[in-house]
């Protein structure tokens, strides 16, 4: 059973996670940048810790600082929310390697789903329906040749 979860996010998603923690009897730890001081998610937390630094890279994306705060506050788990560090396989692995519980997809799943082509192949292999598409390495004529089988409107990337 989890006892204390650090929420590595801010705003509405942090509020939702902190409320869910409270309902489950889990203490919630919020991290916040200086400009988020006094906002609702910091008020909902059992513990709120201000991040050092300016800007996202030094605060909400600073993996080492966030892990250190979790450890110093006796957290047993980290919930990333979405965005920010939730899509970073290296952060998920660092959380696991530090002995904490990562509340999210495995680092392997994050890696597979982070690359669109790998995600598409993985989903097809798992029998999940995917939107028709083609990987085209040729020129305009190849695009024109496969376009009818893909369907319109056609998005090129």
Task: Please report, for each region that a protein language model flagged, where it lies by residue.
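N-terminal beta-alpha lobe that positions the nucleotide/phosphoryl donor
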Residues: 1-156
């Amino acid at each position: 059973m989890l006892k204390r979860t650090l929420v590595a996010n801010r705003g509405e998603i942090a509020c939702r996670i902190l409320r869910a923690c409270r309902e489950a009897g889990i203490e919630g730890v919020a991290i916040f940048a200086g400009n988020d001081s006094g906002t609702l998610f910091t008020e909902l937390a059992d513990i709120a810790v201000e991040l050092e630094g300016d800007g996202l890279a030094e605060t909400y994306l600073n993996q080492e600082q966030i892990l250190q705060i979790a450890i110093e506050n006796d957290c047993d788990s980290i919930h990333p929310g979405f965005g920010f560090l939730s899509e970073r396989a290296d952060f998920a692995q660092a959380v696991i390697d530090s002995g904490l519980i990562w509340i999210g997809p495995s680092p392997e799943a994050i890696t597979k789903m982070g690359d669109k082509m790998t995600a598409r192949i993985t989903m097809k292999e798992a029998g999940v329906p995917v939107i028709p598409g083609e990987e085209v390495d040729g020129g305009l004529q190849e695009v024109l040749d496969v376009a009818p089988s893909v369907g319109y409107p056609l998005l090129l990337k």
